[in-house]
Amino acid sequence: RLCRQYRAKLGDAHPGDIRTLDDVRKLPFTTTEDLRAGYPLPLLSVPDTEVLRVHASSGTTGKRKVLAYTRNDIDTFAFQMARCYELAGLTPADRMQVAVGYGLWTAGAGFQLGCEKFGALTIPVGPGNLDIHLQLLQDFGTT
């Protein structure tokens, strides 16, 4: 039952069939329609009781596209975002002010998870309210 969509798309393909870059190009992509078809929890490869969080698109072009996150997904997401900060030259001594949106979309949560995993002071302000941003920037020395 789990991830029937992938099983159907991949057909008889097996990991051993992928030997070259050209073989990878033959694999089907996950499309917007794939995500919408399984709404509200599309493309699960675990029981839905293992889903800890969902994020979704705004739904402006149709049904929302939902991404379901397990504990492992959240941990991996935090690690990837922390790695981005490291590669950008930041250090845990930096103070990061998260100015992107929080809510259904994944941006705010992802930036915050990454900051915390990275070990930097995190100030989750969100978008807008320039006065608060400026005050916190001055008060905390946001880098």
Predicted regions: what is each one?
Residues R1-A56, T61-F79, R83-L87, T91-A93:
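Nucleotide 5′-phosphate-binding alpha/beta core
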Residues N72, Y102, P124-G128:
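Alpha-helix capping and helix-loop boundary segments enriched in small/acidic/polar residues
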Residues G62-Y69, A93-V100, L134-L137, T142:
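Short acidic, glycine/Ser/Thr-rich loop/turn "cap" segments at secondary-structure junctions
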Residues Q5-A8, A109-T143:
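Conserved adenylate-forming
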Residues L41, L52, R83-E86, A107, ...:
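General N-terminal targeting signals
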Residues E86-T122:
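Conserved AMP-binding loop of ANL adenylate-forming enzymes
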Residues D75, W105-T106, D131:
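Loop/helix-junction capping segments adjacent to catalytic residues or to phosphate/diphosphate-binding pockets
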